[in-house]
Amino acid sequence: TSANIILYYKGYDTSPLEQYVALAVVAGALSNMGAVAVLNESAHTSLPAGVFKSQELGKHSLEMLREGFPLTSLFCGFVKYEVEGIEGVWMRTYGADCFGLPDFAAHAQGHHEGQKYSDIFNNVLRYLLESGAEMAAGHTMQVGKTTFMKLRDPLDDEYYLQGPGTTLVVELIEEDECNAH
């Protein structure tokens, strides 16, 4: 026998992060009763339910889910895909609009750059979430010692980057390129 359960938040906290944390705790409890996976449809991603067991997260599991758990793991999904006729791999987030944040996309050389972009996107989303700062097309932000990300809107022929919220395309540039445009 198999079944699925749809979880949704019906509490009083207005913070999307707190709502996701509450749902993750329930998913962890359900994994003790045989739940196999947790799917976040708006983030286009899933994880094994066992990841959310309190034994896996440790003594401070709520703090871990709030502060240490990568947003791009489940709350804002990270997806890589190839587009026919285009060299390289597109990497992007989904679901950041649930937090009132933009999704980010980047055109990478290949799948081997996945961790780099996942880390950049996670760090920027976490910064925006915690600081309340806003980013838009035309903005730049330092993401490494000499590396900056420059943001732009998707081009008309980049229809595959459209989503329910704002998507900003990340182009990595070096420090000397910041004021060159």
Task: Give the residues covered by each predicted segment.
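Aromatic/basic-lined ligand-recognition segments
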Residues: 43-181
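Internal, hydrophobic cores of structured domains that mediate oligomerization or house catalytic pockets
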Residues: 1-76
